[in-house]
Amino acid sequence: MKIYRAFPMAFSHLGQRTNNQDYLYPNVDKATEQTELFVVCDGMGGADKGEVASKLLCEAVADYVITMGNPTLDAAHIQVILNRAYEAYRTYLAQNPLLSRMGSTLALLQLHQQGATICHIGDSRVYQLRAGQVIFQTKDHRQVEDMVEAGIITATQALTHPWRNRLSRAVMASVTDKEGEPVKLMADIVTLTDVQAGDYFFMCTDGVLEAIDTYILETVLASNMPDQAKSESLQALCSAHSKDNYSGYLIGISYVAHTDSAQSIHTITNYAD
């Protein structure tokens, strides 16, 4: 299939923080209708150079895809990218001995002839919406999510649990990592083969989620406003209600040639040996 995109809308703001630890690829105002790869990262911990971690991870993704000639990403490609990001972290830590660790979330969207590949680690999200409804959403890698699934706490309790912001997965390196020890980085990878004209993909860091829930997102994207106005509406809500950095990408699908009527989803969870 051939996927034609509207002009992508991106934003990244401080919120009520003193520095922005989110990073986007392409940077704000750099994407075009021809852009196929979108990356949203949220660095962890101000003292641990979260803004550097998110930038290094975005750069690892972009550099790999450009160097390899824009391959359709699969689990093997993603693992190479994560290994390179991990090594970039290790190098930075070695050059900055006052730091003990660094890490970032990852949300990745690649549009290609087979549809859309989505990869994520942590709690930065990717949504697919159609006709004003979310039809796909990544699952946050948070400790409370695992506790809910295990029946330890309820979904309601998770909302106020003291561990609600703790990640169960992230792209992370620490000075305590042993040299030569196998890298254990985990990514959820999904390929969506049902992409249709009028669909939206929305990617965001968790700061956006302080202001925007599923109902609000569906309502805004179902409106008759142009894409720029939709993006501005989401940003206005975040400006009013988000304490954290908030960043996102809104990608509208304008036309798809040879769209299949049925949705096929192939999910791979990749664990490094």
Residue ranges and their predicted role:
Residues 1-273:
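PP2C/PPM-type serine/threonine phosphatase catalytic domain
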